[in-house]
Curated annotation (Swiss-Prot):
This is Solute carrier family 25 member 32. Changing residue 235 to R: In RREI; results in impaired FAD transporter activity and lower FAD, FMN and riboflavin mitochondrial levels, when expressed in murine skeletal muscle cells; motor function impairment shown by a mouse knockin model of the mutation. Ubiquitous. One of its GO terms (cellular component) is mitochondrion. Facilitates flavin adenine dinucleotide (FAD) translocation across the mitochondrial inner membrane into the mitochondrial matrix where it acts as a redox cofactor to assist flavoenzyme activities in fundamental metabolic processes including fatty acid beta-oxidation, amino acid and choline metabolism as well as mitochondrial electron transportation. In particular, provides FAD to DLD dehydrogenase of the glycine cleavage system, part of mitochondrial one-carbon metabolic pathway involved in neural tube closure in early embryogenesis. Changing residue 128 to T: In NTD; uncertain significance.
Amino acid sequence: MTGQGQSASGSSAWSTVFRHVRYENLIAGVSGGVLSNLALHPLDLVKIRFAVSDGLELRPKYNGILHCLTTIWKLDGLRGLYQGVTPNIWGAGLSWGLYFFFYNAIKSYKTEGRAERLEATEYLVSAAEAGAMTLCITNPLWVTKTRLMLQYDAVVNSPHRQYKGMFDTLVKIYKYEGVRGLYKGFVPGLFGTSHGALQFMAYELLKLKYNQHINRLPEAQLSTVEYISVAALSKIFAVAATYPYQVVRARLQDQHMFYSGVIDVITKTWRKEGVGGFYKGIAPNLIRVTPACCITFVVYENVSHFLLDLREKRK
């Protein structure tokens, strides 16, 4: 009886969660993720190149963001700046779509039947849960993106390049490295869910406090400028707190180096490069992710409000 009771209770909990699922959040998240990453992909390429620059001879040497961009442009043109764009678009669109999808469902589930709003820690946990669920699905796409971005020596036009596209990369990684290869960087990626959790917690609280400050309803829709400001502040806070894990993950996924695991990456990076090694690429990352976050959240908020309003009108 106890087992049956637990099973029924679990089933009831899941059915309650699914009642709060809204496809509008998925569509809005995908829209925001795709548009922002398509616009700013070259800066993501620069960030990855800097994150893995550990002195290995085969890697190109860059003196800064502009030098990196111009060097890639001279060697490979526009296609070079968009190496790895296909898995990045798939990964970003799917990640943001699923993230908002899971996050809003979890958040709605937790607030059902409650008069009071969620606490800061509840926003944090909800976002972390959504991030972990999303990463389980999207990690292979991030490995693929990193591998494609780290092909050097004018590889865009080279017949000898190791990977020829997203699906070719996925197949080759699975063939030669198995499922484990597709999930390289998964552990630091899980730590990375703290980034999204911190960002969403800050974003929710900033929106709430701002609306309270100007005497508006807590759920009132903000203007575009207000969304941009709140999104930028929450992103900068999250990046500053969690950037080192991105360096660790990128180095684990790099096909030119072999590390036995997360501890090995941390130890070697610390020994050779010190604290600065864990923050390589943070400048291009901030330049990229702050506007990308603003685009994503502005598109998401406006598309989701539009679609959810349509749902209400159809009732």
